[in-house]
A protein has these predicted regions:
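Cationic, low-complexity basic patches in intrinsically disordered or flexible, solvent-exposed regions
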Residues: 3, 7-8
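Short, Lys/Arg-enriched N-terminal segments with co-localized hydrophobic residues
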Residues: 9-17
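Structural signal for interior beta-strand "rungs" in well-ordered beta-sheet cores
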Residues: 19-147
Length: 147
């Protein structure tokens, strides 16, 4: 995967990681080697990002969320927020995203609710097209195109 984010103004964290100088990354986030984080993105506590993932500009990642290997999350996506369901009262729930997914521009994905299984799951090699929404407690298998 190739990032569309220009490499100007990136801060090299080490030889394998490039994070833009304007990205905000919580100290409690866990980020593997080989992860690129673009301008003005916010990575919250409880977020885990595995190697090879590209986070483009203006992406918001909230936890608890685990993002697998070699995913590409495009600009203005919001991933891992709590459910807007009226029954949801802020209980600890999570989001799990597999490997090799493309999450295009403006996609929103909510964590689960305790009234269901407490987790939203996205499998491997999926394409979530621009402005699609994955609601709380959904489970998406592998090789799905979501419009």
């Amino acid at each position: 995967m190739k990032s569309s984010v220009k490499q100007l103004y990136f801060v090299r964290i080490d030889q394998n990681n490039m994070h833009h100088e304007t990205a905000i990354i919580d100290k409690k986030a866990k980020i593997d080697e080989g992860v690129t984080i673009g301008p003005y993105s916010v990575i919250g506590p409880g977020v885990r990002i595995l190697k090879g993932t590209i986070i483009e500009s203006h992406v918001i990642l909230s936890g608890p969320t685990k993002i697998g290997k070699n995913n590409h999350i495009f600009q203005f996506s919001t991933v891992g927020d709590g459910s807007p369901d009226k029954k949801y009262k802020g209980e600890p729930t999570k989001l799990t995203i597999g490997d090799g997914n493309q999450i295009r521009e403006g996609v929103t994905i909510h964590r689960g609710t305790v009234q269901e299984k407490g987790v939203t799951k996205i499998g491997n090699n999926n394409l979530l097209l621009a402005y699609s929404h994955v609601a709380h407690d959904c489970e998406i298998a592998d090789n799905v195109v979501l419009t």
